[in-house]
Every structure is written in C-alpha cells, then in structure tokens.
C-alpha cells in the first residue's frame, strides 16, 4: 500500500497502540481498527534504557490487517518490549525548513546534532518529508549550462543548471572528494544555498566535510543532513528525503536556486533493499528490492526545476565491483542529465579528477545548448583520445616506432591532452600544498584547441600535469627548462 502526503501536514487525532512483536528494526504495532495510522505516519514510543528515558521513532510501512501495522524503526530498538505503548503522531516525519537550518547538522528526524552547550534551536515551520513531485506544467523548460571551472567536466560532460548529475565510480576513485570540491566551488563562485545529504556516510567523511566547510567559511550557507553508516536502514532510506524537503523549501518558498549534494545514492538503494528484506518482500535481480525503480523515481522526480527556480543535484554513486550493469547504478542512469564516470585506470596514472572522458556523457553536449565552438572542440578531443585508445594494443605489442607518422602525432597530443585534463582542487590543498584553480570555459576551449593544433608539441608532457590554463603550462615548462 502507498500513500502520498502533500504540503505541510497538520497532526491529526493521535491513536494509541501496543507493540505486538519486535524483530530487529521491524516492529509490529496493534491499534484499534478505527484509528489505524496511515502508511508513512510517524509513530513514537517512550522507553527507558539504562535509566535514561528517550523517545523512539518509527515509520509505518505496511498495514497487515485487523488493526495491526508493521513499522520500521529509525533508531536502535534496544530496550523495546511487547506491550509498550505507541502513539501515532498523525502525520509523517517532519523536518525544519528555512534559513534557520543553514549552518546546522541534522539527523533524519530533523534533530540538530551540532548545537553548542546552552544553545537552543527554534524554527517557525516544519515540512513532512513525503511530498508530491511538481506538476508537469510547473517545470522549467529552459536549459542552461552550469559552469564548474573544472576543465574535464566543463569541456566533455557539461552540467545542466537544475539538472541531475551522477558521479559514478568504484571504491576509492574520488567520488566524495569531487562532491566536496563542488561544494567548495559553488560557495566560492556561485553563492547561493546548498543542502548536503550524507546517506550511509562514514562518520570520518562527515566529520572531515564539516571541518573543511567551517575552515572555508561556507558552512553558513549549507544545511547538512546525515544518516550515518552505523544507523538502522530506515534512517538511511529516509535521510535523502529529509534533505530534499529542506531544498524544496528554498526553491518553492524563497525562490532560490539550490544545490543538493547526495553521497551516496547506492547506499540509499542498499538501505531500501535491507528494509524490503526485513518486510519479507520477495527479492528481485541480484537480491535488490522488487520496487527499486519506484523508490528511485520517488526521490529523483522531486529533484527538478520549477519556473524560475531550480534544484541542481550532484549525486555520488558507488558502482559495486566496478560493474555498471548492476541494477543499483543502472536504475539511476535513466534519471540523470549528465554522468561523470571516474576511472580506476586514470586514477592509477595520478590524473585527478579521474574522469573518464570517453564514457562520461551529458545531455547538453549539443551545439544548440553549448555553442558550436564548444561542441566542435569536445568532439575533436574525444576523437583524439579514442584513436589513442585504439592504438594502445599496437603500441603494447610492437612499440610506438611501428606507428605511422600521423598516428605518432595523435598519440603524442593525446598524452598531452590526458595530462592537461588533470587539475588541482581546492579541497586537496591540505594534501598537496598546491592551491586549486578555476578555469573559465572559453579559456578551456582555447587551450585544448591549441594543443590539438600542435602549438604545444614542443612542450614536455609533464608540464601539462595538474595545471589550470595554458599560462600555468608555460610557467611550468620554463621551470623545467631551467632545471635541465
């Protein structure tokens, strides 16, 4: 059974039930037949654990019949007993919205996690996390490029203002670093409000992100919502909706362009799979939940642009065992406007961001959106890199000397292009000691055209590595020549 809750819900008449069964995070609760809570309603149960009283929150997932509902706990169920009293709040989980959320760290239930001692948090309005996607006639039809200042992204996989962007990659190839870099760049170059959803985030990563944002002075324009890796699956499944609800308020009520960062969509799918198994549903392909496409669509369809206002979403997506045919990443592909695939092979060369220029895609890599000059340059660079890839087998067997003169030139320029696609990032400065760089799109196009034309054939390959524009390359080349 499903139900959709619209707009801000008022608490209805509260029903009271009793716990009938507890199996891990799954709790069966018996209510009077005439006051059963609706699907997605939040239930509360008071319990005492080690002498400390606390309120446990649950969300109704199924109606079993005869007044019995099955709920998923959003907190550990230690200390929960049969017969304990449960109260129906009359509405879904709600989270605080508005300017008061900026600079704060929340959990899935909208509770603040970073209050100083003696500090209080008051908010005028709370919204339910289950909401309808905007109607078709409210959507924005205009398409505009979102400039990041990162060469490989702006040139070959341009992002869409108000679009959905996926950062795909296996473990350890730089998804979270790229997400953190985009947060830093948005705050530095674009201003505006950001919302970050840590779905199944490692505690260390979350802490690093908060510290970096505080040091950069950008946390005051960001709301952060975490459902950490060690929390029950119900929490991890709903944390993205909590963050999205906060972002929707900034878009719909305040009329702002919002950036929504989600790390990691795979763990959203994984949490849904755990909940589905706990509820006894028959698993689908590779053990995933049978309603995977529906669950993903419910989240993704709400991330969109309405007339004049947008939510631009950047989503890190873990690819299990680097297998892109796995149902979790494959289901996400259909919803995205741009895909940035991070390659372990490119990362092993020390080229960062480790974006694969040949497999990454964008809906707006088209002359009508980005202009003919940008499109021609991108296609030209892709052709050179593709030809270089085709020649690698010949080089591995026979060596470079066996290539034709034309192919030797292509390989030489492709190697320079590969290295010029690397770039220092602001968030990696603490490791490298080198300041990040932002390169305008016009400068990026000019630089790659000059390399493809052969104007920099005389410059050593290492001079192109981790540079911003061609000025940096020339400066580095001059330093290399001095040291020879």
From Swiss-Prot:
One of its GO terms (cellular component) is plasma membrane. Keywords: ATP synthesis, ATP-binding, Cell membrane, CF(1), Hydrogen ion transport, Ion transport, Membrane, Nucleotide-binding, Translocase, Transport. It is found in: Cell membrane. One of its GO terms (molecular function) is ATP binding. The keyword Transmembrane does not apply. F-type ATPases have 2 components, CF(1) - the catalytic core - and CF(0) - the membrane proton channel. CF(1) has five subunits: alpha(3), beta(3), gamma(1), delta(1), epsilon(1). CF(0) has three main subunits: a(1), b(2) and c(9-12). The alpha and beta chains form an alternating ring which encloses part of the gamma chain. CF(1) is attached to CF(0) by a central stalk formed by the gamma and epsilon chains, while a peripheral stalk is formed by the delta and b chains. This is ATP synthase subunit beta. It comes from Nocardioides sp. (strain ATCC BAA-499 / JS614).
């Amino acid at each position: 059974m499903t139900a959709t809750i619209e707009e801000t819900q008022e608490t209805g008449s509260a029903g009271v039930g009793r716990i009938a069964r507890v199996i891990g995070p799954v709790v069966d609760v018996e209510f009077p037949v005439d006051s059963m809570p609706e699907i997605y309603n939040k239930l509360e149960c008071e319990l005492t654990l080690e002498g400390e009283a606390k309120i446990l929150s649950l969300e109704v997932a199924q109606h079993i019949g005869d007044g019995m509902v099955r709920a998923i706990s959003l907190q550990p169920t230690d200390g929960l007993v049969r017969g304990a009293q449960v109260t129906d709040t009359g509405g879904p989980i709600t989270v605080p919205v508005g300017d008061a959320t900026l600079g704060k760290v929340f959990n899935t239930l909208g509770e603040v996690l970073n209050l100083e001692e003696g500090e209080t948090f008051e908010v005028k309005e709370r919204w339910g996390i289950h909401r309808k996607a905007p109607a078709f006639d409210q959507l924005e039809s205009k398409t505009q490029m979102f400039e990041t200042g990162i060469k490989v992204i702006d040139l070959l996989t341009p992002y869409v203002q108000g679009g959905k962007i996926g950062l795909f990659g296996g473990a350890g190839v730089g998804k979270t670093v790229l997400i953190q870099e985009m947060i830093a760049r948005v705050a530095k170059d674009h201003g505006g409000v950001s919302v970050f959803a840590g779905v199944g985030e490692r505690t260390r990563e979350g802490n690093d992100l908060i510290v970096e944002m505080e040091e950069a002075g950008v946390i005051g324009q960001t709301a952060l919502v975490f459902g950490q890796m060690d929390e029950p699956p119900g929490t991890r499944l709903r944390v993205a909706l909590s963050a999205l609800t906060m972002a929707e308020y900034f878009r719909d009520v305040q009329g702002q362009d919002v950036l929504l960062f989600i790390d990691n969509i795979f763990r959203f799918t994984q949490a849904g799979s755990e909940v589905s198994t706990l509820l006894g549903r028959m698993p689908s392909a590779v053990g995933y939940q049978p309603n995977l496409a529906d669950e993903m669509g419910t989240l993704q369809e709400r991330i969109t642009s309405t007339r004049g206002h947008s939510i631009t979403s950047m989503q890190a997506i873990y690819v299990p065992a680097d297998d892109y045919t796995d149902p979790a990443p494959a289901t996400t592909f259909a919803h995205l406007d741009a895909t940035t695939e991070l390659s372990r092979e490119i990362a092993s060369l020390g080229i960062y961001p480790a974006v694969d220029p040949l497999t990454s895609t964008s809906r707006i890599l088209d002359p009508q959106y980005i202009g003919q000059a940008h499109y021609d340059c991108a296609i030209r660079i892709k052709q050179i890199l593709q030809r270089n890839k085709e020649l690698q087998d010949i080089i591995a067997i026979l060596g470079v000397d066996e290539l034709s003169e034309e192919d030797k030139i292509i390989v030489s320029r492709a190697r320079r292009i590969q290295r010029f696609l690397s770039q220092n990032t602001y968030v990696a400065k603490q490791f490298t000691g080198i300041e990040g760089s932002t390169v305008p799109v016009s400068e990026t196009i000019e630089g790659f055209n000059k390399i493809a034309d052969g104007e920099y054939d005389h410059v050593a390959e290492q001079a192109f590595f981790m540079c911003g524009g061609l000025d940096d390359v020339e400066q580095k080349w001059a330093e290399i020549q001095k040291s020879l």
